[in-house]
Amino acid sequence: MQALIQISDKQYLVKTGDKLFIPHQNAEVGNVIDLKPLAQIDQEKTSIEPSGNVQLKVLEHLKDEKVIVFKKKRRKRYQKRNGHRQLMTQVEVLSM
């Protein structure tokens, strides 16, 4: 069984035991987050308005890989380099 969940305007197709990285959530490590799924998918049928919740356990908070932003104006001797690391949360799907 799989479930389609939405977190911070992003959708994820998950099943029990999956580990995934989601945008930073304000929850402590070890806490459980309950989400209502958008859809549940079995082998034979798909339920668009399912009952029940998906439980996610917060494993850790970390930063994503660095993204380099480089600006340059030709012939003006102007160039600027900036880096950014997005905060992420790693979660594990406990149950559906």
From Swiss-Prot:
Gene Ontology MF terms in the entry: rRNA binding; structural constituent of ribosome
Entry keyword Ribosomal protein: yes
Record's GO cellular component terms: cytoplasm; ribonucleoprotein complex; ribosome
The entry's keywords: Ribonucleoprotein, Ribosomal protein, RNA-binding, rRNA-binding
One Pfam family here: Ribosomal_L21p
Entry keyword Ribosomal protein: yes
One example of a Gene Ontology biological process annotation: translation
Similarity section: Belongs to the bacterial ribosomal protein bL21 family.
Function: This protein binds to 23S rRNA in the presence of protein L20.
Self-association and partners: Part of the 50S ribosomal subunit. Contacts protein L20.
Protein name in the entry: Large ribosomal subunit protein bL21
